[in-house]
Amino acid sequence: MYINTETEDLKTAIDAIRKAVKDRIAPLAAEVDDSGVIKPEIYDLLWDLGLMTVTYPPEYGGSETNPGTLLCIGCEEIAKACASTALLLIIQAVGSFPLMHGGRKELLDRIAPRIVNNRELAGYLVSEPGAGSDVKAIRTKAVKDGNDWVINGTKCWATNGPIASFYSCLCRTKDDKGVQGYSFFLVERNTPGLSVGKIEHKMGMRGSQTSEVILEDVRVPAENLLGELNNGFKLAMKDFDMSRPAIAAQALGISEGAFAQMETYSRERYTFGKPLCEHGMITQIIADSAALIEAGRGLIYQAADLYDKGKKNTKLASMAKFFMGDAAVKITTDAIQVFGGYGYTHDYPVERMFRDAKLTQIFEGANQIQRIVVAREIRDEQSK
């Protein structure tokens, strides 16, 4: 089933996002990549558009309808020009999810208005040096001490690590070899014992700041527990069902941006007396890329639609992520090929888009893991 993302109730939002991308975000994309910094006014723009809180409960600034779809639309449209900026939407949604959908009302009433009013950035502390896609391998521990929990461990690949005001931190709270025994806690940046470690210098999405976050005897009150004790793994999996379509939408946007660049160039560049687009091998690249984009769009917005309706979308979310992530790497690689030597230089955006696309195959569960998830979901469906 194809989901029409340009129905009347979404068109106003889409038009506003597209205008912001054209006028404000696209002109700065190369500078963001070169400097590794997104300017404060771009953060404010995303807040003003409502994209930083779109997946929050409505009472805290979220969308009453279609939050997953709107998140995907924002990621797709922005990533056409700047994938680093699109990543801000994803990490805000991911890092806030355990709080917004697992925090107790008293905690939410105290924290959420401050986050929205002060425009505070979220971080997500799950990955560790020995635990990436294998979430169950985390070693960061939280130990109960009176009315507090004391956290010790090192987290890595923390998007927004150096600049977040608060983090959702997954810890081991019970020795258990299965999925039980993990819990999320809200940890605020100014908590004693929390420090930022190594800042990563990445291949792509350089405008998004990524670092280690070190927790040494970090003490948080018991009320900062997010979700049920020892059931954090389940909350993390629900978070993935929201984030994976959004990452796929980011990959879709990168692909569309690269496609637009190479299709235009193929019409303007002449070789052997005719435009590139009239050479057989180039027409195949154009056609294959267009087909991948359309197929990926269908998967993405179907997964987002299921999420918005409160239905299980795990299989489609993982399908969308691995399909579109792999497609983005292929499309951006082919775009460089169409540009030839020019595409290999920093002077044309397809080089940046290629570097950005690679991350969509890796984060929020590597694409190899996504295939395992899909196969497991199919087995479960057939056994019912």
UniProtKB/Swiss-Prot annotation:
Its EC number is 1.3.8.11. It is an enzyme of class 1 (oxidoreductase). Gene3D superfamilies: Acyl-CoA dehydrogenase/oxidase, N-terminal domain, Butyryl-CoA Dehydrogenase, subunit A, domain 2, Butyryl-CoA Dehydrogenase, subunit A, domain 3. Pfam families: Acyl-CoA_dh_1 (PF00441), Acyl-CoA_dh_M (PF02770), Acyl-CoA_dh_N (PF02771). One of its GO terms (biological process) is protein tetramerization. Keywords: FAD, Flavoprotein, Oxidoreductase. Its cofactor is FAD. SUPFAM superfamilies: Acyl-CoA dehydrogenase C-terminal domain-like, Acyl-CoA dehydrogenase NM domain-like. It catalyses: cyclohexane-1-carbonyl-CoA + oxidized [electron-transfer flavoprotein] + H(+) = cyclohex-1-ene-1-carbonyl-CoA + reduced [electron-transfer flavoprotein]. It comes from the Bacteria. GO terms for molecular function: acyl-CoA dehydrogenase activity; flavin adenine dinucleotide binding; oxidoreductase activity, acting on the CH-CH group of donors, with a flavin as acceptor. PANTHER family: ACYL-COA DEHYDROGENASE, ISOVALERYL-COA DEHYDROGENASE, MITOCHONDRIAL-RELATED. NCBIfam families: CyhCrbnylCoADH. Belongs to the acyl-CoA dehydrogenase family. Homotetramer. Mediates the conversion of cyclohexane-1-carbonyl-CoA (ChCoA) into cyclohex-1-ene-1-carbonyl-CoA in biosynthesis of cyclohexane-1-carboxylate, a by-product produced during fermentation of benzoate and crotonate to acetate. This is Cyclohexane-1-carbonyl-CoA dehydrogenase. It comes from Syntrophus aciditrophicus (strain SB).
